[in-house]
């Protein structure tokens, strides 16, 4: 991971890395039924976090900001906390700040309150705290429960607007939710040189996005932000973390004649070592039943969105024709959904021998 300083002289700027939404020990159970998938992805979370810490160490970055949802409070294991803390020990000269989020609030019994973190770690609570250094003033606050609606940002007074100032918190910039709703306009009005925020897993001007993708709704590259701040002049860049990505593709089954052909087609897909979700589309006249054990490992989810092929003339008075006609009437009246229609149609025609 190579970088070039944006400013000419070191004394002109302060440097930081901003990480958000790691979600250590998240279950991943809704993504794939494969027993080993969750453990594999949790190992990737560890590798991704280590890449970020190695970057900090290699480039002697002075500040590390972790803007909440570092871990999943419901599932977190002490061994994972030990892993995190041991990595922090590798960067003793870096000042580390954590603003707990709605998934890892600083509750009475949390690891944030009941663990011997290394000395260079500061963990914010729900009250805004200001910490002053020669090169920057840092204002931070975080969750102490699974909800926060106190609008604490409005009450922050930036005392020295001529100095580098940074806000660290976990919150929602785009919706008036129970997860610390905050305003981009207020952030700008306060005069912060940088706002280290997390909560939204998609990267944009404020959010770094999740460090490692957590599912098919988070496609593309993931990583963290490296930044340099000098008297309100901000330079930043996205640093990609090497990981398997989540990819969604469609497979048209219209030209296929059997379930076995579908399985063969799935096994020919070049997954490039990424995780794939496949949508089966098109029209078919055979029943689909995919045994996940028969397809390549990196295809972790297959959804059948194909439709059963129906060839029916208006004067078809057979049991088959009457069945389809009645089913069509239920669909048109809104009594059943398209998905339900397709399922009943397939089961019915299979029973009738098509």
Label the model's feature ranges.
Residues 3-81, 347, 354:
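N-terminal active-site segment of His-dependent metallophosphoesterases
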Residues 37-43, 135-145, 244-257:
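Acidic/glycine-enriched edge-of-secondary-structure segments
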Residues 58-60, 160-161, 269-271:
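Glycine-rich phosphate-binding loop signature in dinucleotide/nucleotide-binding domains
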Residues 60, 137, 191, 272-274, ...:
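Short loop/turn motifs at secondary-structure junctions
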Residues 63, 72-223:
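His/Asp/Glu-rich metal-coordinating catalytic cores
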Residues 198-256:
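A conserved active-site cap/scaffold subdomain adjacent to cofactor or substrate pockets
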Residues 234-354:
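Accessory, non-catalytic peripheral segments of nucleic-acid enzymes
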């Amino acid at each position: 991971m190579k970088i070039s300083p944006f400013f000419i002289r070191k004394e002109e700027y302060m440097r930081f890395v901003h990480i958000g939404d790691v979600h250590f020990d998240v279950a991943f159970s809704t993504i794939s039924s494969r027993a080993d998938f969750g453990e594999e992805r949790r190992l990737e979370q560890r590798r991704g976090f280590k890449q970020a810490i190695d970057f900090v160490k290699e480039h002697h970055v002075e500040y590390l900001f972790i803007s909440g949802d570092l871990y999943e409070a419901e599932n977190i294991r002490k061994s994972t906390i030990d892993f995190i803390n041991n990595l922090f020990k590798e960067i003793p000269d870096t000042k580390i700040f954590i603003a707990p989020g709605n998934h890892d609030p600083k509750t009475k019994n949390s690891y944030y309150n009941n663990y011997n973190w290394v000395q260079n770690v500061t963990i914010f609570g729900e009250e805004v705290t200001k910490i002053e250094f020669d090169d920057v003033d840092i204002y931070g606050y975080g969750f102490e429960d699974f909800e926060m609606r106190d609008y604490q940002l409005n009450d922050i007074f930036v005392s020295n607007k001529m100095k580098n100032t940074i806000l660290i918190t976990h919150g929602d910039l785009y919706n008036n939710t129970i997860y610390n709703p905050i305003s981009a306009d207020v952030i700008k009005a306060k005069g912060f040189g940088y706002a280290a925020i997390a909560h939204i897993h998609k990267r944009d001007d404020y959010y770094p996005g999740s460090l490692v993708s957590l599912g098919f709704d988070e496609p593309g590259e993931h990583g963290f932000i490296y930044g340099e701040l000098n008297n309100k002049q901000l330079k930043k860049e996205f640093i990609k973390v090497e990981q398997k990505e989540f990819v969604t593709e469609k497979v048209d089954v219209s030209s296929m004649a059997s379930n076995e052909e579908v399985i063969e087609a799935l096994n020919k897909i070049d997954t490039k070592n990424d995780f794939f979700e496949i949508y089966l589309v098109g029209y078919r006249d055979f029943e689909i039943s995919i045994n996940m054990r028969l397809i390549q490992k990196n295809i972790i989810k297959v959804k059948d969105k194909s439709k059963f092929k129906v060839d029916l003339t208006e004067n078809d008075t057979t049991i088959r024709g009457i069945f389809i006609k009645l089913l069509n009437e239920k669909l048109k009246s809104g009594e059943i959904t398209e998905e339900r229609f397709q399922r009943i149609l397939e089961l019915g025609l299979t029973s009738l021998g098509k």
